[in-house]
């Protein structure tokens, strides 16, 4: 029987995409999981560990966000196939590694500043605060998926195509992207309440 070393096996996401990508934002490096996995499905092993979701592959976190309440709630295989098809579309349209495009989209659409409510003596103040890196990634993924769902709802365009277009638009910092618009809105509100 042959023995294989784990390091010698070249794992790629969906059997196609390499996870050796560049993260330019230093604050997000720890929170964008790029470990090589063939099937991004950990089954909630991170659930009870503090900052456990930071170790989750970023593709799986995208899949989990596609499963948000609504039509796709709890249907992980459907979400998996949506993301897989969206990645194929991204590769066809851009000619780049879709994981690199996704990471760039997350970097561009992650808000840096937001508003929090502070109650002081019965009066509510809105104060601008910096966003934690983990929350930046969470918000970016959520807004990317929300934009895709909004674009494909009551529309003949399939969600796979909408998700691919949203990720490509966010990666190129296009103001037509829902995630970029949402980020700018959050930062504008934070700027006004400094």
Swiss-Prot record:
The keyword Plastid does not apply. One of its GO terms (molecular function) is structural constituent of ribosome. It comes from the Archaea. GO terms for biological process: translation. One of its GO terms (cellular component) is small ribosomal subunit. It holds the Pfam family Ribosomal_S7. The keyword Iron does not apply. Belongs to the universal ribosomal protein uS7 family. One of the primary rRNA binding proteins, it binds directly to 16S rRNA where it nucleates assembly of the head domain of the 30S subunit. Is located at the subunit interface close to the decoding center. NCBIfam families: PRK04027.1 (NF003106), uS7_euk_arch (TIGR01028). This is Small ribosomal subunit protein uS7. It comes from Sulfurisphaera tokodaii (strain DSM 16993 / JCM 10545 / NBRC 100140 / 7) (Sulfolobus tokodaii).
